[in-house]
């Protein structure tokens, strides 16, 4: 039986509370209903994510399977026994483990050589990271099978990060491109079991010239610490940076109108949703694959 377990929830919401209050004509100084509004925002974001079958803000999930997949019959002998990761956009794999025939837990590592590196472990996986609403696909290295397994429930576990992007608390020193983020480990491109965070967009408030934001990207990763492509002009300490891409504006608007609908109709409602919500979330953002 396949199951999905949320390991790390989003650290923020795509829509600011102030924007939601503005839509409802509630003064920012009126905080009497903030807890209700935040609950409606969360419910609206989850409704949009569940409908589109994607992840908006960075989150970590654990997928548990009862076995590696077999090749779909419709592909005959040219089939690809792929693991398709739900909730795109994909970011990186934390680990990929399975129970071998002796009952021991083993880790699979990524083979970026597509099976041409004979020195690589025989059992591993290839990664096609997908993009946008297309899910990542993991398959055995070329001309190799998945590893033999002991047939017990939940004998395969894959933990991964997904979402367009999310907030990250960081510190930078003036003149340095090193990004310090306690408690967060960046994934290097040469690590065996992940796609790599090199090239990920980073926006650090206050670290640019004249107090502006430093908009750059991860140039390299060493021991889990990222070095950016551009050094900080000013020092910043424990500021909330943004790692990755921004959530598409259409989906943010869909969340706003969905939250407004929940707020105005109440917790129990059988009314049809406004057409504008369907139009916004159907605008090329629905994952129909995994």
Task: State what each model feature region is.
Residues 1-175, 179-198, 205-290:
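Divalent metal-cofactor coordination and adjacent catalytic microenvironments
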């Amino acid at each position: 039986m396949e199951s999905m377990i949320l390991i790390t929830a989003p650290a923020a919401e795509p829509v600011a509370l102030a924007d939601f209050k503005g839509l409802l004509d509630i003064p920012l100084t009126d905080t009497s209903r903030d807890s209700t509004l935040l609950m409606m925002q969360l419910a609206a974001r989850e409704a949009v994510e569940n409908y589109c079958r994607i992840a908006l803000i960075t989150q970590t999930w654990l997928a548990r399977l009862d076995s590696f997949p077999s090749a779909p019959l419709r592909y005959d002998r040219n089939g690809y026994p792929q693991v398709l990761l739900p909730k795109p956009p994909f970011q990186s794999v934390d680990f990929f483990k399975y129970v071998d025939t002796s009952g021991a837990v083993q880790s699979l590592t990524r083979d970026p050589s597509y099976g041409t590196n004979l020195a690589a472990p025989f059992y591993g996986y290839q990664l096609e990271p997908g993009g946008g609403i297309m899910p990542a696909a993991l398959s055995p290295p070329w001309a190799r099978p998945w590893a033999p397994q002991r047939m017990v429930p939940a004998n395969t576990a894959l933990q991964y990060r997904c979402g367009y992007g999310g907030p990250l608390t960081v510190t930078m020193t003036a003149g340095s491109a090193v990004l310090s983020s306690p408690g967060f480990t960046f994934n290097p491109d040469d690590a065996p079991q992940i796609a790599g965070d090199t090239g990920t967009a980073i926006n650090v408030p206050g670290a640019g010239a004249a107090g502006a934001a430093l908009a750059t990207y991860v140039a390299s990763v060493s021991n889990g610490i990222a070095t950016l492509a551009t050094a900080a002009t000013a020092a910043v300490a424990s500021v909330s940076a943004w790692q990755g891409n921004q959530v598409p504006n259409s989906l943010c608007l869909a969340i706003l109108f969905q939250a407004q609908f929940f707020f105005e109709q109440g917790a129990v409602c059988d009314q049809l949703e406004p057409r504008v919500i369907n139009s916004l979330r159907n605008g090329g953002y629905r994952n129909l694959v995994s």
